[in-house]
């Protein structure tokens, strides 16, 4: 045994197991501006004190393990360990607590969402001492944010590229999502864009299947884009899904899209992975492509209130990793989404500085230090009667995306697009004239029906459609 080993082994090391809270629960700790801060909803197993549970989360997501180890003496735990610095009860929940954990910045690789999540939401979520664990929010410090490129272009650059201002953008997901040939798919794209939409979209699971290979789809969609642009005089786009089985194949598809001269590609960022997403975002910035992000698989992670991760964390991660659009729920459509919580993470996507606001689920003040913003996309079970509410909720910097609400029009795809464009223009004009969309929305739509038979037909078809189911993931304190 070397003298150095003898010295280290003899200075204060004692083998065995000790409580996590003795090392990792530090209520006296004052957080630093460079710390990554996390708010965890912790449900300890019966008999496990909240302080021990919170300390266990801090330990197992940073430097700790289940027993003391000799090599702790070879580093500075005080410099590198995570710290549970505050615990508070959850209103109305006797067995749940919010544990606040601070992580030193040196624990994380620069510019890597993958590495950040591997620590913070890694093995600790399977820890036996916890009945359930959910990451509610993260504070990303400016020092770490500055190591990321973020969205390829951002909101203002996108508007300049499209020459579209003063209103939400309109989109449509082509349906049926699977089974169409590339030529019929391109036809639907053309009809929707010609009818007045700004964008059409590949559904998230359209990649390169036997019925429609990706290269054929890209070619027919590009033809549809150029034809509709020539006929309308407007700039158009189609989200060509570049998601693939390998990063190399994904980039190959993005390269082909750029060669066709289209303006935007798409990625499924959770199923594709953050490493792939960041790589694609870098390619898109370097080559002038906008990047639309779909959040397929998010509800597996974020829907249950006591375990997993809230979507506001996934939204922050996407802004770091890179994307110009991301699906963010609708509040009024068929998919899960509490209004105040949704508005909270919509602001976190778009704004440069967002204050702590627990009434909207925002646990920490977030300074994005001029990282470009992301357009929230409202999509899922929406139609023309929802247009006033969507315009009022999401504002101008958003994409309102009607799939069935366009293609389900009784007269066809182009009239469906016309109906949505007329409804949107009517709502924007009414808002600009000072009318209250929340109160007068239905009246505004009825007035517009008088001079748009396409809108009148759409209103008749969907007048009884409602998705009145309670939200599962409500903010704390809501009934």
UniProtKB/Swiss-Prot annotation:
Active-site residues per Swiss-Prot or TrEMBL entry: 175, 294
Site (Transition state stabilizer): give the residues: 334
Q: Which reaction is catalysed here?
A: 2 (2R)-3-phosphoglycerate + 2 H(+) = D-ribulose 1,5-bisphosphate + CO2 + H2O; D-ribulose 1,5-bisphosphate + O2 = 2-phosphoglycolate + (2R)-3-phosphoglycerate + 2 H(+)
Q: Which residues carry this modification: Phosphothreonine?
A: 330
UniProt family annotation: Belongs to the RuBisCO large chain family. Type I subfamily.
Give Gene Ontology CC terms. chloroplast
List every position bearing Phosphoserine: 208
- Reported EC number(s) for this entry are 4.1.1.39
Which chain regions cross the lipid bilayer?
none
Top enzyme class of this protein? lyase
Q: What is its main location?
A: plastid
Q: Which organism is it from?
A: Barbarea verna
Q: What is this protein called?
A: Ribulose bisphosphate carboxylase large chain
Molecular function in Gene Ontology = magnesium ion binding; monooxygenase activity; ribulose-bisphosphate carboxylase activity
The record describes how the cofactor is bound as: Binds 1 Mg(2+) ion per subunit.
Q: Does the keyword GTP-binding apply?
A: no
Q: Coding gene?
A: rbcL
Q: Return one Gene Ontology term, BP aspect.
A: reductive pentose-phosphate cycle
Where is Mg(2+) bound in this sequence?
Answer: 201, 203-204
Q: How is it modified after translation?
A: The disulfide bond which can form in the large chain dimeric partners within the hexadecamer appears to be associated with oxidative stress and protein turnover.
Q: What does this protein do?
A: RuBisCO catalyzes two reactions: the carboxylation of D-ribulose 1,5-bisphosphate, the primary event in carbon dioxide fixation, as well as the oxidative fragmentation of the pentose substrate in the photorespiration process. Both reactions occur simultaneously and in competition at the same active site.
